């Protein structure tokens, strides 16, 4: 062990495992350093001389040098003072000193500072950060947070949120403000947005929201709330809405206030405070141009006055009032007629009534579509009346095709196959192969819905089986006007890539039990061709449809019933459709003035067409053809054989022609014959035939086939008059014992 100076104390004890520093030299240095942590013994600083090294001590410090121990002790003192100050300020929040560590709990950090070859400045900076992190929670920096309610247009909420919330997330990230949008507007045109954050963050978020709304409206960025406050050219006016009537102005789902804003071109805000009593009047703020604001105020007051009068919101004979308008239900198959070709009809209704009409969008499955009429109440009712008149004219419908054999011709076409009432114009039933039904219906019914919307017709699958019961086919029904049915038929044929097979009669044909149409002349026209409906009576007058129904073809009297054509129409549905459309689309325009002569029978197959009659009509050929057809029909069992009166009728007409021209025997030239007796006999026979008191005669004859007159005293049809005049006098050679021409041997 080395010698010490005379003035120095004896050396300290050797440090364990590599010794500590020696004692301070003469001159009185500070206490020796702590024990060495490694195999090296740190020499303590000496004022008068170097300290003694340990057994394996490290190198001694130079004389008078200040080693790291001085700086570390000073730093530890500063930390201790800081902790004392923190304890005085924070009380129990101050951090306690761990007595298990040598120097104020920083023994664990000694190796971090001592080990390594980093400069001392980095070591101190790292230690300062550690101290600051421990002292940081004691004094958090002051931060001001606020929450503000902001309003944006309800229609712009989707634009503010963005796809997948992208836009609202960008607003929150860029502004540092939390943005929350209320889930519902409560019927108001604006949606509440909650902004939470620092004042500058909230202000930035508001600016970003204004920019998005302004861009969505097509205006310059940042102009939304400036315009909402009226701007330089705008006017803001508030009117008080009485308690309990705020919902009337707002409407269901905000529909009424939206319509008012659209019609007046203003912005309306109903100020509602949740803390207010429901019995308190609420202000309605109207923003816009002065003239428009005044007009909007009048519209709102009109709504409130109608409510006071009890007329608003009630349902009338035309539909339901909603938001100052009227909803009129229109059958789906009649929508195309109300709209008209290229919208001509609905434009005409709008111009005449001074309203606006729109059909509401729906799923296309219901039987009706809603036409919403917007405008003043009296004009809305006028437009609704026009639409209902048009629908009423549709219910009478165009004439249908001929019915079954022996049935009267079709009347006005609303009769279905079962005789019940249906849509105007009737319906069409057709069969489609089962494996192609999916092409018509589509996934979820989307194809049939599209067909209904495009054509205005109503297409549905029938639950009835095909007539032959074939399970490989399904029946479909199309209801609507002829134009709508044709359009829907064309679209369906494109889907299945083939023609449709109609089943049953065409639209408007009366069923087996269907009543006769209002224009059917009655049983008198069931006789042979050439006879007038009522002998000597004028034809039915032709009145064009009045009002809004004049867009449809005018009704013409039906042609004489032809049994062969009726049988062909019953067996071939296509023939019935062809006759129906030819009658519907090719009618001669305008009524025919004056009594028209009875139509002649169509020429038989293979015969040339007859020239138009001039002067006195000759029905000889028509009667011959009629009796030939009657003779071809099968006789009923037990009925007496029919006789051929063709020659007798020819002779009869020849003599009648002579009488009419004044060449008959006993007729003075130029004198008008007297038909009184002939008319009396004719009406007596008609009364006896139709169940009234029969004239004197023998027993009733047995029933004969349809089309043959069968009554006592009138077993054969009376001779048809010329130009609606009865025969003058029957020739004695042609008169039977009872005054009837051509006695059959059954009648007396």
From Swiss-Prot:
Record's compositionally biased regions (Pro residues): 8-17, 398-408, 502-521, 529-543, 588-614
Alphabetical list of InterPro entries matching this protein: FUBP_C, KH-I_FUBP2_rpt1, KH-I_FUBP2_rpt2, KH-I_FUBP2_rpt3, KH-I_FUBP2_rpt4, KH_dom, KH_dom_type_1, KH_dom_type_1_sf
Gly residues bias (residue ranges): 18-28, 36-69, 409-422
Cross-referenced PROSITE patterns: AA_TRNA_LIGASE_I (PS00178), KH_TYPE_1 (PS50084)
Record location of the Glycyl lysine isopeptide (Lys-Gly) (interchain with G-Cter in SUMO1) cross-link: 122
Any one annotated GO CC term: cytoplasmic stress granule
The KH domain, residue ranges: 145-209, 234-300, 323-387, 425-492
Cross-link (Glycyl lysine isopeptide (Lys-Gly) (interchain with G-Cter in SUMO2)): 122
N-acetylserine carried by residues: 2
SUBUNIT field: Part of a ternary complex containing FUBP2, PTBP1, PTBP2 and HNRPH1. Interacts with PARN. Interacts with PQBP1.
Protein name (database record): Far upstream element-binding protein 2
Source species of the chain: Mus musculus (Mouse)
Lineage of producing organism: Eukaryota, Metazoa, Chordata, Craniata, Vertebrata
């Amino acid at each position: 062990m080395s010698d010490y100076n005379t003035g120095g104390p004896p050396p300290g004890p050797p440090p364990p495992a590599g010794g500590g520093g020696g004692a301070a030299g003469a001159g009185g240095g500070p206490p020796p350093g702590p024990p060495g942590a490694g195999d090296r013994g740190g020499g303590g600083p000496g004022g008068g001389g170097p300290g003694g090294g340990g057994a394996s001590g490290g190198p001694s410090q130079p004389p008078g040098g200040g080693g790291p121990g001085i700086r570390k002790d000073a730093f530890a003192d500063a930390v201790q003072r800081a902790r004392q100050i923190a304890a005085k300020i924070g009380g129990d929040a101050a951090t306690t000193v761990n007595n298990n560590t040598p120097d104020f709990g920083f023994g664990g950090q000694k190796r971090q500072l001592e080990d390594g070859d980093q400069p001392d400045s980095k070591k101190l900076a790292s230690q300062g950060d550690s101290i600051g992190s421990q002292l940081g929670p004691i004094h958090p920096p002051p931060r001001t947070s606020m929450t503000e309610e902001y309003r944006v247009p309800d229609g712009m909420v989707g634009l503010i949120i963005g796809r997948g919330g992208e836009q609202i997330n960008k607003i929150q990230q860029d502004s540092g403000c939390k943005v929350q949008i209320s889930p519902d507007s409560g019927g108001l045109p604006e949606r509440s947005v909650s902004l939470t954050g620092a004042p500058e963050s909230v202000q930035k978020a508001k600016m970003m929201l204004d920019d998005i709304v302004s861009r969505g409206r097509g205006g310059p960025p940042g102009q939304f709330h400036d315009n909402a406050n009226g701007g330089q050219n705008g006017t803001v006016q508030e009117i008080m809405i009485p308690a309990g009537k705020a919902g009337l102005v707002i409407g269901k789902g905000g529909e009424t206030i939206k319509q008012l804003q659209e019609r007046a071109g203003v912005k309306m805000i109903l100020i509602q405070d949740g803390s207010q009593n429901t019995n308190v009047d609420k202000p309605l703020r109207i923003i816009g141009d002065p003239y428009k604001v005044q007009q909007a105020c009048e519209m709102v007051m009109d709504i409130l006055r109608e409510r006071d009068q009890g007329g608003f919101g009630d349902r009338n004979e035309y539909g339901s009032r909603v938001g100052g308008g009227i909803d009129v239900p229109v059958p789906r198959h009649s929508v195309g007629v109300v709209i008209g070709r290229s919208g001509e009809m609905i434009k005409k209704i709008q111009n005449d009534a001074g309203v606006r009409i729109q059909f509401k969008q729906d799923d296309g499955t219901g039987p009706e579509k809603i036409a919403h009429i917007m405008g003043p109440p009296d004009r809305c009712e006028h437009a609704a009346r026009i639409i209902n008149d048009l629908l009423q004219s549709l219910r009478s419908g165009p004439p249908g095709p001929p019915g079954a054999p022996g049935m009267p011709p079709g009347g006005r076409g609303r009769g279905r196959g079962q005789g019940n009432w249906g849509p105007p114009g009737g319906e069409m039933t057709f069969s489609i192969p089962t494996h192609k039904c999916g092409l018509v219906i589509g996934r979820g019914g989307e194809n049939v819905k599209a067909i209904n919307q495009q054509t205005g017709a109503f297409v549905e699958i029938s639950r009835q089986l095909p007539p032959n019961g074939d399970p490989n086919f399904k029946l479909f029904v199309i209801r609507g006007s002829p134009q709508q049915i044709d359009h829907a038929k064309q679209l369906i044929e494109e889907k299945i890539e083939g023609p449709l097979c109609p089943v049953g009669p065409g639209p408007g044909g009366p069923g087996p039990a269907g009543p006769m149409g209002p224009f059917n002349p009655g049983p008198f026209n069931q006789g042979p061709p050439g006879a007038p409906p009522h002998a000597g009576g004028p034809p039915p007058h032709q009145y064009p449809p009045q009002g809004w129904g004049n867009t449809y073809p005018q009704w013409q009297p039906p042609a004489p019933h032809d049994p062969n054509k009726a049988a062909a129409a019953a067996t071939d549905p296509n023939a019935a459709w062809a006759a129906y459309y030819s009658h519907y689309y090719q009618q001669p325009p305008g009524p025919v003035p004056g009594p028209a002569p009875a139509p002649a029978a169509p020429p038989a197959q293979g015969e040339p067409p007859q020239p138009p009659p001039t002067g006195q009509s000759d029905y000889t050929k028509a009667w011959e053809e009629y009796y030939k057809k009657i003779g071809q029909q099968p006789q009923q069992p037990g009925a007496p054989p029919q006789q051929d009166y063709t020659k007798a009728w020819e002779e009869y007409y020849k003599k009648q022609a002579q009488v009419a021209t004044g060449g008959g025997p006993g007729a003075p030239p130029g004198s008008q014959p007297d038909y009184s007796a002939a008319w009396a006999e004719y009406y007596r026979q008609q009364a006896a035939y139709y169940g009234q008191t029969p004239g004197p005669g023998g027993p009733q004859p047995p029933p004969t086939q349809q089309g043959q007159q069968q009554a006592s005293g009138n077993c054969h049809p009376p001779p048809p008059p010329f130009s609606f005049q009865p025969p003058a006098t029957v020739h004695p050679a042609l008169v039977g014992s009872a005054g009837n021409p051509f006695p059959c041997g059954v009648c007396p």
